[in-house]
Swiss-Prot record:
This is Phosphoribosyl-ATP pyrophosphatase. InterPro entries: HisE, PRib-ATP_PPHydrolase-like. GO terms for biological process: L-histidine biosynthetic process. It comes from Natronomonas pharaonis (strain ATCC 35678 / DSM 2160 / CIP 103997 / JCM 8858 / NBRC 14720 / NCIMB 2260 / Gabara). SUPFAM superfamilies: all-alpha NTP pyrophosphatases. Pathway: Amino-acid biosynthesis; L-histidine biosynthesis; L-histidine from 5-phospho-alpha-D-ribose 1-diphosphate: step 2/9. The gene is hisE. It catalyses: 1-(5-phospho-beta-D-ribosyl)-ATP + H2O = 1-(5-phospho-beta-D-ribosyl)-5'-AMP + diphosphate + H(+). Belongs to the PRA-PH family. Its main location: cytoplasm. It comes from the Archaea. Its EC number is 3.6.1.31. GO terms for molecular function: ATP binding; phosphoribosyl-ATP diphosphatase activity. The keyword DNA damage does not apply.
Amino acid sequence: MSGDGHDGDEVLDELFEVIESRKEELPDGSYTASLFTHEKGENAVLEKLGEETTELLLAAKDDDDEELAHEAADIVYHLLVLLSMKDMELADLRAELRKRR
């Protein structure tokens, strides 16, 4: 673990802001925007979460730390997209995690 302090919070906040912005503006060529307009709707994100979870499990099984971090980041990203699709906030996730301390 690195000594980044609350940098992780800032990264998540910034990422969620970008996701929310893409949801509103739907810029051409944006992968994030394409998830909000996909013909499968939220099922596209749910499928992606399943795919990324499988890849994360394989990376863990193979003791591939670099790939594990990569796949974990993919899961977090797609989870944040799903929260946005459900009109939830990052604060909702944080509140639930605080309850579990």
